[in-house]
Amino acid sequence: MRHIIQYTILLLCCPLMTIAQDFDGHNWMQHLDDSRTIASLSIPGAHDAATGEGVHMVSGFGKTQELSLAAQWDCGVRAFDLRPAVIGEELHIYHGPIRTKISFGKALEILCDKLAEHPTEFAIVLMREESDSENSTERALWPSTVGKAIENIGDKAAIFSPAMKVGDARGKIIFISRNAYTGCNRGAIIKGWSHSPQGTTNATITSLTDDATARLQMQDYYAPTDKEKQKAKEEAVLQCLQRAASAPADVWTINFLSGYSNRWLGFTPFATTSGYKRNAQRIHPIVIDSLTAKPQPTGIMMLDFAGCDKTGGGIWHWSAFETFGAEIVDKIIGQNFK
């Protein structure tokens, strides 16, 4: 009854947002065997997850999520793209130059609270430094400030290893960063990230504990702003999905379905929220159909509007978007149990 009341309130607050829930997303990982490698799982994630907490700018720009971090968790999301920047001496989460309404510390507190409530689960936090708003002094502080924030959560931060198992991670956060941080030996650093349509099969994830290194195959082609590029994005997502299907159990896959299909007046970095919605409306059904026709492991799949099947319109688009964000989260989770 409590969960029904929570979702009723959420729907009343967001009348243009439709949320579908076919299972209990709070603790779906309880059904996973402890011996399974995390690299071999199918895990739904949220691209620029903190934008669901609100942004300090007109929401027509840079907003990639409708749900809060807690609500993303509740619908089954377990990978969170968080991009902290040092402002003064504190960490705030940004998307490019756009500041969200939540600090990095508060975001970690929310995830730690969820893990305390649901100790069978684990979370993955993908990080990168969002340096657009930092000055040179703040950039120099980023590695140590992030390391201190992770160190502050103690053993809630997991020790990364290439073939780490579900049982190793329950109740913990796995930190995987695209920028090096210092002062903490938990988590891991990515090298070789690519934004090309082809992605890469030769990136690496290296543990800060013992330098053990995993191979990473990934795709993050984020600006499919015309028809040709949109087709390339579709092919890139499906190619990365195909690679995940045949990957060894200790090879990690990160597949960003996210992207924006139009820009404000043709310029970057002002990617419009409606551009992200339009991309989700096109890409998500393609992946859902692929997984329906041929179930397979997916790796970590980063989504826009995770948990929302329908969202409101935006700049130059007044009608609602069918973003299929709840259906695709359910579909990804379901691949673990085929």
Positions of predicted regions on the chain:
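Conserved, mostly hydrophobic/aromatic
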Residues: 83, 125, 175, 301
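An acidic- and aromatic-residue-enriched active-site/binding cleft used to recognize and process polar
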Residues: 84-87, 127-130, 178-180, 306
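Bacterial Sec-dependent N-terminal signal peptides
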Residues: 1-21
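Active-site beta-strand/loop microenvironment that shapes enzyme catalytic pockets
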Residues: 76-86
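Long, acidic (Asp/Glu-rich), low-complexity accessory segments flanking structured domains
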Residues: 21-75, 88-117, 122, 183, ...
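Active-site periphery "cap/insert" segments of enzyme catalytic domains
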Residues: 90-104, 132-153, 165-166, 170-173, ...
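Surface-exposed substrate-engagement region within the catalytic domains
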Residues: 152-295
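Active-site groove signature of glycoside hydrolases
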Residues: 119-134
